Structure formats: structure tokens, C-alpha cells
Amino acid sequence: MKLISPPVRRTATAPATAPGARLGWLDALRGIAALIVALHHFDVLRMLPFGGAVWRNFDMGLFGVMLFFIVSGYIIPASLERRGDVRAFWIGRIFRIYPALIAAFVLSILMLPAGDGSVALLRTGDDLASLVANGLMLQDLLGVINGMNVTWTLCYEMVFYFLVTALFTRGLHRHSAPIAAALAGLALAVGTAVGTQLISAELGSTRQLLLIVTPLVLAGLAGVLSGRPVLTGTGALLLGGVGLFLITLNSRAPAFETWMIFATMFAGTVVYRAQHGQLARLPALLSCGFVVVAGVLVGWLYNHGEALDRTWSSGWKAWSVGYLAAWALFGVGFLLRGRRFPRVLTWLGAISFSVYLLHIPLLRTIEPLVGVPPQPSSVLGRIAWTALFLGVVLAVSHLMYRLVEMPMQRLGRRVQKAADRRWPSAAHPAPAASTAPAETVPTEAAPAEAVRVLSGPPRTGG
């Protein structure tokens, strides 16, 4: 379903910066975040003499999560609006995420030692519910344990796709600034007043929720993939409504964290719109500034007591400093966006989704082979162990990227073209035309890679 025409390429004022430099800063940020993710789960802080102090005052996990969410918010709406084709956007998303996710599940199950719980896809007591919820990528919002320890953030990413698509089809996609500010205000106002997982309190209610949500989501996806304006709009509203319902009443994360995740993603969109002249700088600065301040304040106000069991952080300082640091690094990357970044960082950004999916299964596979735990006691031993872990993760992730991600993305483009030939999208008047030059719209990225652990029993400590 094409809602807007592709923006006309501007030739009179072509940017002087090379394309690689324009997008290199985003790849570099994803690469840095992926490295932080891997080292966080590697428990690198336990090997440092000052690691305890860092853990108490800086949450590496939250830092990585929020940095990925900011980047995702910057990129995802732009990739949808680039051609104004909802079906093309969703086909692209499906072929970017699911092949790598399925391959990671299969590879992990094959290589993990017996008894390891890193993959819980078929170990939840209800295999069908686990497969369906994880297949929809909504398990963390349906009360179902994540099939893989780190996939909880893909649920919030998926709901972001739902919301962005719904806003786009209604012509409301340019209202990113008030949406981001409103969500941040909601996080501040609600805090922990609204409980978590209010619907799926036990297995029976979880199954009932699945029976309701699954056909609604499938119907919504069928609509947005139809290429028909009415069906696309209806499907998008259905997906947006389901997503909003789930994050409001059945999120595993505390309300303040849930709403801040979405405020952060929409604030990333605000940055993109301000950069490309779709939004004045003052409202953009006010909106993003309020989101950043709210992110720091919600940690101070609410990240205490029982909330720590669901945010998996050591305290409010760790949450607030980690959140602020994510925005600080994004800001540095944004200021340096016209420069060329080291190739190793852009390469790391390219393979970051595979790094995210595979680093824990690879860690659990390597550990018994080298006799860890316990951690090496000598400095040289710790350096060697860290180098071995990173070397294996990066090598296997590179292979996954080349052998799975890239071919499947190419297949997705062929499927999209075939769908356009077989079922041409009907023309639809544009809700609002894009003003960004075509060559400055960033390409789609992998979903927001993240670092938290299991959706079921909360993890305590570092």
C-alpha cells in the first residue's frame, strides 16, 4: 500500500558527505552497543577491580538497550516513509528478523550443552503457547517466557512497528514530538502505580489471552500485507490497538520503563525529523530534552524495591546514569555524523543483530570447554578468555550475517517485487509528503538489540 510518493531527489544541493560517512555513524553506534551487550553478559565487570563500583552506578544493560532503541526510533519510521509502501516495509522487516532469529534458535539448540537453559522455547510447560507467542514476537507482553534469553526487547520493537504503521496510515506520523513527550510524561505520572502483567497472571489466563491476540495480530498483518488501502489502514489500526492494549495492561516491565522505552524510540524519530527539516528545532529540542530528563527522573523516583526485580538493575543511579549515557553517546555520534568511522565499527554494526542473538549461546557453549567458571584469576588469563570469547562471537556472527541475513534480505526484496507484480498496490493519496531528500534517508536496521535476561523468573544482581 503506497501512501506517499517517493521523495524527489535533490540535485542542486547534493550533500558533500559520502554515503558511507552519512550512515557510518549509525552503524558505529550499533556496533558499540553490540559490543557492550556481549561484554555485559560476559560479566566483564566481575573481572575488573573497579567493576563493583561501576555496576552500582552504571547499568551496562540499560545503556545498550536504550542506545539501540534510540537508533531504531531514528531509522524505522524513515524506512517506512521512504517509499510510503506499508507492504514493502513489513516484508522487509519479516525477512530481516525472522530468518536470523530462526537460525539462531536452531544453532543454539544444536550446540548448547545438555541442561543449559539459555533457550527455553520448548521448555515452558506449554510448547504450543511458547511457539505462538515467540513466533508473534510478543511473548514478553503475553506472559510467556522468552524463547531465547535476550529476545524480550524484540517484543517492544514489534509494538513500535505496530504503532508507527498505524500512525502512518492515519497521516499522524509527523507528530513524533508531542507523542514522545506525552509518553515520557505518562512514564513520570504512572511510575509503578499500574501493575505488571495484569491479564496473564497464570497459565490459564495466558492461554486465553493468546487465543484472543493471535487471530487479531494475524488479521492485522494480513491487512498491512494486502496492498489494499482500506485493508491496510484497518490492519494497521488493529495492530496498533493490540500493541497499545498489551503494553498498557500486560507488560512484564514496570510501567515507567515500558513507557520510557516508547518515549525513547519516538524521541529518536524526533531527531531524524529535525535533522531533515520536517520539524522545527525548538519543539524538537524541547521534546527530546523532556524525554531525557524524564528518563533520568523515573529512575530516581521509581527504580527501587520490587521494581529492581523487573528492571534487573542495582538501583536508581545505575538506571538513570545508564539512560543518560545512551543519549550522550548517541549525541556524540550525531555530531560526528559527517565523518568517516573506522571500518571495524561499521562492520560490527552490520553484524550486530547476529552478535545479539548468538553471544549468550556461544558463551554457554565455550565455557565448559575451557573450564569456566570459575573466572581466570590472572590478568593474562582474563585477557585471553575475553579475547577468545569475542573472537568466537564475532567470527560466528559474521558467518551468520553473510550466510543467513544477507541472502534472506535479498530474498525479501525479490518477494516484495513479486508481490507488487502479482498484487499491485492501489494508489492512495498521501497523508503528508516527505521533505527529506531521498539520498539522506537511512536504510533499515536490524531490530533494537538488547541485553536483558529472562522474561520469566527475574534475574537478581549484576
Predicted regions and their residues:
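Membrane-interface helix-loop-helix regions
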Residues: 97, 101-162, 185-200, 319-330
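Functionally critical transmembrane alpha-helices in membrane proteins and complexes, commonly lining
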Residues: 21-80, 95-101, 105, 325-329, ...
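Transmembrane alpha-helical segments and their boundary/interface "anchor" motifs
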Residues: 62-66, 79-118, 125, 130-133, ...
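Structural signal for the C-terminal ends of transmembrane alpha-helices
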Residues: 77-83, 112-113, 166-175, 219-229, ...
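Aromatic-anchored segments of alpha-helical transmembrane domains
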Residues: 35-42, 183-197, 238-251, 289-304
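Alpha-helical transmembrane segments of multi-pass integral membrane proteins
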Residues: 62, 257-273, 285-406
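C-terminal "closing" transmembrane helix and its immediate cytosolic amphipathic cap
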Residues: 1-17, 333-349, 360-462
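Interfacial loop-to-helix transition and helix-capping segments at the boundaries
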Residues: 23-24, 53-65, 144-156, 195-216, ...
